[in-house]
């Protein structure tokens, strides 16, 4: 199979809604000029051996030419000269050119890494959850095999918890939810077993493979450092250090949480770009003004999604250092993050931008658009969980940039280069969390936990697209390209 990429001399105005036959529209995503000439790419080779991947993969074969990008080893954020300056005329509300490549497939098979706990226990070593001695499962009392999903459990409870969360299972206790969980009762009452799993600290956010990425590992290291610092402070106090020394230590800690000049510059640049790329308010208001038919609601949601993607492309273009990445990596990052960034931006609109009292109305209208409750329920659950964190706009912007610059996306050739761009953003976000919510040292970890929840929407979204295609729904060409809809 040979794919051709042809440059567009003039922007092509997209019709609001058209059928999604293979189009000639492609995004030349981070280029200042239209693509010239014709490029070909040979597609071959299996996507992967894990059979669980195949139901959700929109492409079965792919191979890209090897490119060795040149990445400077110097600091990415040392001066303003690194930040891209984009002319206003680049933006077009029409179509963007994009080279087609397979969208990211979420599930890659479970690994030991996915079972590492979010809160690392002191007894754990480099064995990723293995323990010494005959310790017992905190859920059922059977012999524990290690720390799974943040709790010391046996293999049986680990598998039960994984299956229950993955399938969104709902169980019913025949005894009114009063079962005492043990090795016998665990097979008799699934509701009480699942409740005991959660009570003992098992976390759904540890569930999905690929979610315990470098971001979460960094989060774990940071939490460990916070705990060690707290223990050190307590020890110093118990040793009778005078108040002046304690005050000095506290002042020193506070000074460490201040943003450096480079970090302030980075944050200012991110916020300036984020604020310029806004969803038109009239699109959001349209679905609230009056009740439409299911088909009309779907068309409005399609228009909203198209604007989300346009905003995402513009914001992504202006991320510091992004255009130094290999072009294929840029496309992989954009297409791999499109769904997650869209839901994160939607969560901000849902919690901060809607007129007072309109959240329930929006939920009702979306439910009337023909989308299954199977997908709508977790979506609004996520929106509300984001709202509980009381995130600032700075945190929304940084979290969106971190989502885009995820080095674990599929088809990334130079992951180290992407990590170099993401790491400073994580550092700034961590400091802002300490500054904004000093009384809540877990706030940073909670934000990163929401990123793991976001990854599940790739799976939900892929299933929604499959159901929409069966029902012959129409999308704009831009959505067809970014979502790889044939």
From Swiss-Prot:
There is a cross-link at residues 132, 289 (Glycyl lysine isopeptide (Lys-Gly) (interchain with G-Cter in SUMO1)). The modification N6-acetyllysine is found at residues 167, 227. This is Bile acid receptor. Changing residue 353 to R: Decreases transcriptional activation SLC51A/OSTA, SLC51B/OSTB and ABCB11/BSEP, no effect on interaction with RXRA and SETD7, decreases association with ABCB11/BSEP promoter. Ligand-activated transcription factor. Receptor for bile acids (BAs) such as chenodeoxycholic acid (CDCA), lithocholic acid, deoxycholic acid (DCA) and allocholic acid (ACA). Plays a essential role in BA homeostasis through the regulation of genes involved in BA synthesis, conjugation and enterohepatic circulation. Also regulates lipid and glucose homeostasis and is involved innate immune response. GO terms for molecular function: bile acid binding; bile acid nuclear receptor activity; chenodeoxycholic acid binding; DNA-binding transcription activator activity, RNA polymerase II-specific; DNA-binding transcription factor activity; DNA-binding transcription factor activity, RNA polymerase II-specific; nuclear receptor activity; nuclear receptor binding. Coiled coil: none annotated. PANTHER family: BILE ACID RECEPTOR, NUCLEAR HORMONE RECEPTOR. The modification Phosphoserine is found at residues 145, 164. Keywords: Acetylation, Activator, Disease variant, DNA-binding, Immunity, Inflammatory response, Innate immunity, Intrahepatic cholestasis, Isopeptide bond, Metal-binding, Methylation, Nucleus, Phosphoprotein, Receptor, Repressor, Transcription, Transcription regulation, Ubl conjugation, Zinc, Zinc-finger. It is found in: Nucleus. Liver and hepatocyte-related cells express mainly FXRalpha1-type isoforms with isoform 3 and isoform 4 in approximately equal proportions. In intestine and kidney mainly FXRalpha2-type isoforms are expressed with isoform 1 and isoform 2 in approximately equal proportions. Expressed in pancreatic beta cells and macrophages. Changing residue 145 to A: Impairs ligand-dependent transactivation activity, impairs interaction with PPARGC1A. Changing residue 132 to R: Decreases transcriptional activation SLC51A/OSTA, SLC51B/OSTB and ABCB11/BSEP, no effect on interaction with RXRA and SETD7. It comes from Homo sapiens (Human). It is linked to May be involved in intrahepatic cholestasis of pregnancy. May be involved in cholesterol cholelithiasis. Residues 262-486 form the NR LBD domain. Ursodeoxycholic acid (UDCA), a natural agonist of FXR, is approved to treat primary biliary cirrhosis. However, effects are discussed controversial. UDCA is also used to dissolve (cholesterol) gallstones as alternative to surgery. GO terms for cellular component: chromatin; cytosol; euchromatin; nuclear speck; nucleoplasm; nucleus; receptor complex; RNA polymerase II transcription regulator complex. Acetylated by EP300. Lys-227 as is the major acetylation site for EP300; the dynamicly regulated acetylation inhibits heterodimerization with RXRA and transactivation activity. Deacetylated by SIRT1. Belongs to the nuclear hormone receptor family. NR1 subfamily. The modification Phosphothreonine is found at residue 456. GO terms for biological process: bile acid and bile salt transport; bile acid metabolic process; cell differentiation; cell-cell junction assembly; cellular response to bile acid; cellular response to fatty acid; cellular response to lipopolysaccharide; cholesterol homeostasis. Heterodimer (via C-terminus) with RXRA (via DBD); the heterodimerization enhances the binding affinity for LXXLL motifs from coactivators. Binds DNA predominantly as a heterodimer with RXRA. After activation by agonist binding interacts with coactivators. Interacts with NCOA1, NCOA2, PPARGC1A, CARM1, SETD7, PRMT1, GPS2, SMARCA4 and MED1. Interacts with EP300 and SMARCD1. Interacts with XRCC5 and XRCC6; decreasing NR1H4/FXR transactivation activity towards ABCB11/BSEP. Interacts with PAGR1 and NCOA6; indicative for an association with an MLL2/MLL3 complex (ASCOM).
